[in-house]
Amino acid sequence: MSCDEGKLFVGGLSFDTDEQCLETVFSKYGQIQEVVVVKDRETKRSRGFGFVTFENCEDAKDAMAGMNGKTVDGRQIRVDQAGKSSNDRRGGYRGGSSGGGRGFFRGGRGRGGGGYGGSSRFDNRSGGGYGGWIPDYYSSGRESSYGDRSAGGRSYRDSYDSYG
């Protein structure tokens, strides 16, 4: 049975990278027990990360050293020991790398969030569409500072409309 250090996290994958590709790239470091590319449940599309588990811990360490920062399918990948975020001695390092991943995906959700509840909230007051989306996008997380500015934008727009 393999030890915990035999399982590697592989991040930054192209959405086109599959298990076969990862196995081909990592197999030169040793015998692989399992390869998993994590996919979205609904779309079945890659979420951009996966795991490679080696039979031998030393092979996994060699693969981590040899593959971290390399390019696979046009994307620079990150390779680290899986599950180390809960381990105190490497928690800071692991937290930093996963934090970058969260930042990337958070940006996508932020734009999606602006398109959902926020847009309809502004549509009722500002005439909606493009004008409603921009303030909602920028106000997410900073509602108080941008609330005044968007109100000012509406009063300017109202006075401009009165000329017509």
Swiss-Prot record:
SUPFAM superfamilies attached to this UniProt entry: RNA-binding domain, RBD
This protein's GO CC annotations: cytoplasm; nucleoplasm; nucleus
Post-translational modification: Methylated on arginine residues within RGG motifs. Methylation by prmt1 promotes cytoplasmic accumulation.
Compositional bias (Basic and acidic residues): 155-164
Compositionally biased region (Gly residues): 93-118
Membrane-spanning intervals of the chain: none
Keywords linked to the UniProt accession: Cytoplasm, Developmental protein, Methylation, Nucleus, RNA-binding, Stress response
Domain (RRM): residue spans on this chain: 6-84
Principal cellular location given in the protein's record: nucleus
Molecular function terms, GO-annotated: enzyme binding; mRNA 3'-UTR binding; mRNA binding; ribosome binding
Keyword flag Cytoplasm: yes
Domain of life the protein comes from: Eukaryota
Function: Cold-inducible mRNA binding protein. Acts cooperatively with elavl1/elrA to stabilize AU-rich element (ARE)-containing mRNAs by binding to them and inhibiting their deadenylation. Essential for embryonic gastrulation and neural development, acting to maintain the expression of a set of adhesion molecules, and cell movement during embryogenesis. Required for pronephros development. May play a role in hibernation.
Record comment regarding domains: The arginine, glycine rich domain, which contains a number of RGG motifs, is necessary to regulate nucleocytoplasmic localization.
Protein name: Cold-inducible RNA-binding protein
Name of the gene encoding the protein in the UniProt record: cirbp
